[in-house]
Amino acid sequence: MRTRQRRAPTATAGLWSKTMKLLKIVAAVLSAVMLCGCATAPKNQPLEVSTAPIAEKGCVTSPFWVVEDESTGAQIFLLGSMHAGKADTQYPEYVLEALRNSSWVAPEMDTVAFAGDFILQQKCVKYLVLSGTTAKELIGSAYDETVDYFRKNGIWQDAMDSMVPFYWASAASSLVVDKAGLDTSYGTENVLLTLAHQEGIKIREIEGGEAQYRMMGSIPMSVQLETLAQCVGDDNINAQVRDTEELFEAWSRFDDDYFSKLTVFDTAEVTNPSDWQEYYDMMYTDRQQKMADFITDSLSKGELGFVFVGTMHYYAEPSVMTLLEQEGYTVTAIRGISAGDGLIAA
């Protein structure tokens, strides 16, 4: 019997911020979340960094690093984001101080601005619309079972038959997130971007919405269909819920060991390994090179910045960390100590 391998927990490779934009593309942004602390430090001067700061009681100690360039005076903080969270998710003062001291923040895309840009939304969703075929034709014999399951769980939409299977899988991801007790409204992007907008901190998108939607629409069809197949049936959904709960717990405690052991796919378990490798290169390899290039360019210019991208981008090889180290930079982990229970983030 094959032992179930720990996978990156969602059918859409952790792109939960994109899930909600797909399903509620004109939804209002919810920004209510408690943030620990409110102190600010003088801008335009690198911070003195503690590698084991105290995190206020109740705060998450999520994956966090810093990389500096002594020759230029640059200091860039790197936060691993979680695209969904809980209403009581709180970020520690050492994270907020780093954000407020930065000249800019850099997410994959500005999800807050995207939520209010209806023209861009309409442009982006077109990348997920099928051309010359229907979802029923692509899904084939599993179509009726899939539709019935989606209807039963309240995630069916009449427009789905004209959308790529990835869109369907994203709908199922929203079900997983909900069953895991999480909400994308409280994900890292919405929380920190709302704060940045409120405080007038410059926002620099590393990719942007259109680039992400274009990529999602071009995922190999065999990968989209296999991903969707794992989103049908209570056993599949419940397994994803358990993985998602584990993911959130590991993220909350900066659990290096957990993330280092995650896999995106197993060549022995997929129908077309070459398509899955193409997907991996699209989702991770190519994007992480762009992220690393963005960071190294900022370091060479002596900038103070705050980058937050999906946590797996710091672990899936060639990771952002590996690429920065290949350029001669040292990336230092900042592991918060939880004040409430004395736990050191693993």
Task: Say what each PLM segment does.
Residues M1-T19:
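Short, Lys/Arg-enriched N-terminal segments with co-localized hydrophobic residues
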Residues S17-I25, V29:
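Positively charged n-region of N-terminal signal peptides that target proteins for export
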Residues K21, Y91-E93, A292-D293:
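A generic local structural motif
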Residues M34-G37:
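C-terminal motif of bacterial Sec signal peptides marking the signal peptidase cleavage site
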Residues A39-P46:
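Bacterial lipoprotein signal-peptidase II cleavage site
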Residues G58:
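Short, surface-exposed loop/strand segments
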Residues S274-A346:
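A cross-kingdom marker for long, charged
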